């Protein structure tokens, strides 16, 4: 009998108390209709930055001529990936912090790499001291054929960055990015990633419901 494939939900919960980048629009919800004698349904209206919670950035986020998230091909967001632990490493995740999971004695590197930096991701507060990717780390991953990088913090760049150097590497190398992943319970290793963005035709990012499955 086939062993069931284990599933990890690596998405942050989204609600009014979800952390938000300073200046971004937090999550809010208003009820437009509620079930009652004259109404058979509940209907709400949502307002939020598309960067609240676990999300995929579109090229438009860091390139004025970049594609919207609705125009980004989906292939990078589904497929084999490797989760690498760099817990407590920062402010920048350097190559030496992830090299232990990339050695010649390991299986071939999948095209998607997710890095865990938190022991426990802060789901109820903004972390201005978040860990980010060193730009050279992304360059070297791209050289190895990686098409998507992810991290369990709110940005692949430091929170106070004005140049967004790692985002500019993503732009130049044509990579995709996932941010605000929840990797607290996920062991290092290889998985199948499924994290599809919504087809928002004018947006600079999209929420995703990101999950990992053990390989078939």
Swiss-Prot record:
User: What is its EC class?
Assistant: hydrolase
**Binding of Zn(2+) 2, residues:** 57, 167, 179
E.C. number, please? 3.5.1.9
- Matches recorded under InterPro entries: KFase/CYL, KFase_sf, Kynurenine_formamidase_bac
Q: Does the keyword Protease apply?
A: no
As given in the record, the signal peptide range reads: none
Provide the binding site for substrate: 21
Q: Which residues form the active site?
A: 61 (proton donor/acceptor)
Job description of the protein: Catalyzes the hydrolysis of N-formyl-L-kynurenine to L-kynurenine, the second step in the kynurenine pathway of tryptophan degradation.
For this protein, the record's PANTHER family field holds:
CYCLASE-LIKE PROTEIN 2, KYNURENINE FORMAMIDASE
Q: Which HAMAP family match?
A: KynB
Quote the subunit structure annotation.
Homodimer.
Put simply, this protein is called Kynurenine formamidase
């Amino acid at each position: 009998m086939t062993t069931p494939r284990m599933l990890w939900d690596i998405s942050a919960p989204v609600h009014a108390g979800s952390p938000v980048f300073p200046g971004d629009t937090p999550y809010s919800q208003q009820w437009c209709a509620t079930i009652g004698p004259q109404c058979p349904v509940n209907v709400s209206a949502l307002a939020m930055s598309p960067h609240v919670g676990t999300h995929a950035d579109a090229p438009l986020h860091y390139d004025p001529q970049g594609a919207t998230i609705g125009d980004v091909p989906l292939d990078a967001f589904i497929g084999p990936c490797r989760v690498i632990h760099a817990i407590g490493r920062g402010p920048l995740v350097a190559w030496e912090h992830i090299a232990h999971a990339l050695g010649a004695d390991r299986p071939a590197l999948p095209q998607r790499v997710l890095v865990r930096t938190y022991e426990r991701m802060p789901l109820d507060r903004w972390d201005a001291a978040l860990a980010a990717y060193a730009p050279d780390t992304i360059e070297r991953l791209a050289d190895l054929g990686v098409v998507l990088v992810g991290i369990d913090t709110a940005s692949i760049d430091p929170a106070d960055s004005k140049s967004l150097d790692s985002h500019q590497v993503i732009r130049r190398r044509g990579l995709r990015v996932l941010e605000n992943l929840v990797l607290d319970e996920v062991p290092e290793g290889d998985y199948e990633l499924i994290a599809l963005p919504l087809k928002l035709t004018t947006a600079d990012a999209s929420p995703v419901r990101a999950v990992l499955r053990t390989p078939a």
